Amino acid sequence: MEFKELVDAAEKWCTGNPFDLIFAEDVDERRLDFYAEPGISFYVLCPDNLTGGTDNFHVWSESEDCLPFLQLAQDYISSCGKKTLLEVLDKVFRSFRPLLGLPDIDDDTFDQYHADVEEEPEPDHQQMGVSQQ
């Protein structure tokens, strides 16, 4: 994806959350820097498949306070399959929700999917054993 398209997608993503895109650089590295109050910052290095650069996105923060919260997003990026910039940014946003003072979102879709399903009781099975005759 062209870097300009990534910048446009990042700017659009910022309209739905507290983060602002504060810097976009395409010279040395395809880097997007984001910031939100109270002092939450991170950057995304974007893949550059055209010139043989990195294959995956990479997220990081210069802030020691922010780094532990990025672990979820880093694990997500390194998991199987290609990710889009919006998928990565959404995962970062979920990771930072506690720092932003927002309620935590349960990211476990399995539990959400089965939340309305009532479990049927297991049928009683007769004991199998040696009969005494």
From Swiss-Prot:
InterPro entries associated with the record: Maturin
GO cellular component terms, A-Z: cytoplasm
Keywords: Cytoplasm, Developmental protein
GO BP terms in the entry: positive regulation of megakaryocyte differentiation; regulation of signaling
Keyword Cytoplasm: yes
Subcellular location field: Cytoplasm
Intrachain disulfide bonds: none
Name of one Pfam family that matches: DUF4581
Coiled-coil blocks: none
Predominant localisation class: cytoplasm
PANTHER family membership: MATURIN
Protein family: Belongs to the MTURN family.
Function (record text): May be involved in early neuronal development. May play a role in promoting megakaryocyte differentiation.
UniProt-recorded name of the protein: Maturin
Organism: Danio rerio
